[in-house]
């Protein structure tokens, strides 16, 4: 496994928080949150509904560190095309139990698909690792995220000063 600088910083943030060193956890998380590329643009950004509409369900823009799985489309089809892995048969089950039925969470609105079986039974399955035909050649869509920018925000909110937590939230 090869980890770049920001993956190491993200892992440090997670570890420092685990061991109770909130100052170092906050500093490491901030290093990832404020990271810029060579042009001065943010290196990572939080996902948007637009990412989901483009079929990028794992939100590669948020990923600091991930694992590549070349056969992700085949594995997704194997696991989610039947009635083995699903989260309920009603839309309210997914929305209430997982997201609190806010109506504004982009995951609540875009990450679940109603799958109708040959016997007319229907199930809600997660699209997160679905690789669509349009994106199947893109390497970024064949990854399983391990460290994300969103986690760095949560660590910074938990470990940083209260005034900073309000700004980051």
Question: What does each model-found stretch correspond to?
Answer:
Residues 168-169:
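Short, surface-exposed beta-strand/strand-loop-strand elements in extracellular ectodomains
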Residues 1-150, 162-164:
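Structured, solvent-exposed acidic/aromatic patches
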């Amino acid at each position: 496994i090869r980890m770049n600088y920001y993956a190491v910083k993200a892992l440090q943030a997670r570890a420092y928080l685990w061991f109770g060193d909130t100052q170092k956890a906050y500093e490491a998380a901030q290093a990832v949150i404020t990271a810029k590329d060579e042009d001065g643009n943010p290196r990572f950004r939080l996902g948007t509904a637009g990412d989901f509409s483009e079929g990028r369900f794992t939100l590669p823009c948020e990923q600091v560190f991930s694992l590549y799985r070349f056969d992700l489309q085949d594995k997704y089809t194997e696991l989610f095309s039947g009635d083995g892995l699903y989260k309920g048969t009603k839309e309210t089950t997914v929305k209430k139990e997982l997201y609190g039925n806010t109506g504004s969470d982009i995951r609540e609105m875009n990450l679940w698909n109603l799958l109708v079986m040959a016997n007319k039974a229907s199930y809600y399955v997660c699209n997160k690792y679905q690789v669509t035909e349009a994106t199947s050649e893109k390497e970024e869509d064949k990854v399983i995220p391990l460290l994300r920018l969103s986690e760095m925000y949560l660590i910074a909110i938990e470990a940083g000063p209260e005034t900073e937590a309000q700004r980051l939230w």
